Amino acid sequence: MALPLAFLFTSPGPVLVEIGPITIRWYGLLIATAVLIGVSLSQYLAKRRQVNPDLLSDLSIWLVIGAIPAARIYYVLFQWSEYAQHPERIIAIWQGGIAIHGAIIGGTLAALIFAKLKRVPFWQLADLVAPSLILGQAIGRWGNFFNSEAFGRPTNLPWKLYIPIERRPPDLASFEYFHPTFLYESIWDLMVFALLITLFFRSLAGKPRLKVGTLFMVYLATYSLGRLWIEGLRTDSLMLGPLRIAQVVSLTGITLGLAGLAWLYVRKRPLPDVVSSPKDTE
């Protein structure tokens, strides 16, 4: 008799392997994998756009330095009542507890500074990074699976996720199975990635001719749309009073993304497209 599908979504635990005093966690491995794949992809896309791929290698360092600390700070700020009592946990990022919206904010600020220093168009960089960013998010979400965190409400759907009792919210301790929101978001992110990559390669042939900034705006709007829905299922949302912070930020992301696209394509002033871009020489 086949095992219920739910057992396919039972975390083996957060630790991949322990070698003496060294502990390698799934979360860290997935983040590292996402970064490596993202850098390689963005370099490849840069070559196709006739942009120096080394520029993207340098940018990736700035993005990591900007995004990861910002993701942690964002999370800690909205969980301050807990971390104020245990300040030693603030730096324990390997235990989980980072917010993708914080990473996007920190990474964007880092990219703006990088673009200013290198004297290259920010929006050109943003377009080249957008597919890598959403693919990295799809990979990184599986860290939530291994940590048994960021899951949804109780459910009996065939694809339900088992959560150990010690990881369940106190008011839901009697429930065993929950929505695998990590899976929902990972699938959504892959769909957004497919859309962005399709637009990128079709634009190489000029069908359609995309203006600089298009891919990033599409990323911002579409990712935020999926997150808006998925966040409503979660049991551990960061809150500000009665509001789910991620949903507020997602609504903002949808608005900014759509407004950005309207600004690019509706206004009368012609803007350069991204069919051919000059090589960076630095």
Curated annotation (Swiss-Prot):
The family this protein is said to belong to: Belongs to the Lgt family.
Protein name: Phosphatidylglycerol--prolipoprotein diacylglyceryl transferase
Residues annotated as binding a 1,2-diacyl-sn-glycero-3-phospho-(1'-sn-glycerol): R141
InterPro entries: Lgt
GO cellular component: plasma membrane
Keyword annotations: Cell inner membrane, Cell membrane, Membrane, Transferase, Transmembrane, Transmembrane helix
Pathway(s) it belongs to: Protein modification; lipoprotein biosynthesis (diacylglyceryl transfer)
The protein's Enzyme Commission number: 2.5.1.145
Membrane topology listed for this record: Multi-pass membrane protein
Keyword hit for Lipoprotein: no
Keyword Iron-sulfur listed: no
